[in-house]
Amino acid sequence: MPRRRVIGQRKILPDPKFGSELLAKFVNILMVDGKKSTAESIVYNALETLAQRSGKTELEAFEIALDNVRPTVEVKSRRVGGSTYQVPVEVRPVRRNALAMRWIVEAARKRGDKSMALRLANELSDAAENKGAAVKKREDVHRMADANKAFAHYRW
């Protein structure tokens, strides 16, 4: 094992409008081909629409939607003596956020609404109400972990 120093994670700069690191990460996940300003305008328009619908502030509404999509457990493949088991493991907080944001963006991209801002706003409002494709994805992951609870002792 190398004895070099461990490289720390890069610090992500908070987004300019709300000063939230979580929102900056969300913009980065949404961004395509390095077009950050386009991604930011999509996210801000979506949050504005979401805030009007929910009657909460933009960040509160975003946080509620993200909360409903965050997974607590997931399955990881573990090979034991020739057979592979799906072992349920708890998700680390950073990965929890990353998965939730990725699932929301993927679900929004698959929607058939007019603009991406509208698709994202609809997906976020669905997530805030515990419905939609991103929430379904979380339920599926939890169901898989629940079904494979018998292999939890293989955790490492």
Swiss-Prot record:
Any one GO cellular component localisation term in the record: small ribosomal subunit
UniProt keyword Protein biosynthesis, yes or no: no
Keyword Ribonucleoprotein belongs to the record: yes
Keywords: Ribonucleoprotein, Ribosomal protein, RNA-binding, rRNA-binding, tRNA-binding
MF annotations from Gene Ontology: rRNA binding; structural constituent of ribosome; tRNA binding
GO BP terms in the entry: translation
Subunit structure of this chain's protein: Part of the 30S ribosomal subunit. Contacts proteins S9 and S11.
Family: Belongs to the universal ribosomal protein uS7 family.
Function: One of the primary rRNA binding proteins, it binds directly to 16S rRNA where it nucleates assembly of the head domain of the 30S subunit. Is located at the subunit interface close to the decoding center, probably blocks exit of the E-site tRNA.
Listed name of the protein: Small ribosomal subunit protein uS7
